[in-house]
Amino acid sequence: MNYYFSKTVNGKFETIEIKVKTLLKNEGFGVLTEIDMQTTLKEKLHKAFRKYKILGACNPPFAFKALQAEDKIGTMLPCNVILQEHSLNKIEVSAINPMVSMQAIENTALKTVAQDVSSKLENVINKLENEK
């Protein structure tokens, strides 16, 4: 079992980003943080890097359940979703698989939450389609 779900689609980076945010919203997630690694690495290290964005996605009801089940789970929140351009109009979108990332935590209530969140994030990835 991989620690992430992933799919590569054809389309403009910005268009795919909008689609991902819409799919996340449809699954009950909000994007709390956005990190533009291309810009950050250019500004901080003066290094060129491909388009690469990290979206910190949170589903508040599930986050609340997870925090009730395990008070240190905040160290693993939010769920990261990344977009990266491997070549022109070839965009890979990946999302964390919470089932794998939370395997080390022995908590039955948390496992149920992780299964539900994993299913929703996998749905986001599976519903991505090539730009038309």
Language-model segment annotations:
Residues 1-3, 25, 47-50, 86:
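Short glycine-enriched loop/turn motifs at secondary-structure junctions
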Residues 11, 15, 36, 112, ...:
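Conserved active-site and cofactor/substrate-binding residues in soluble primary-metabolism enzymes
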Residues 24, 75-88, 125-132:
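Short secondary-structure transition/capping segments
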Residues 30, 36-82:
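Compact, glycine-rich, soluble single-domain proteins
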Residues 104-132:
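Well-ordered alpha/beta subsegment
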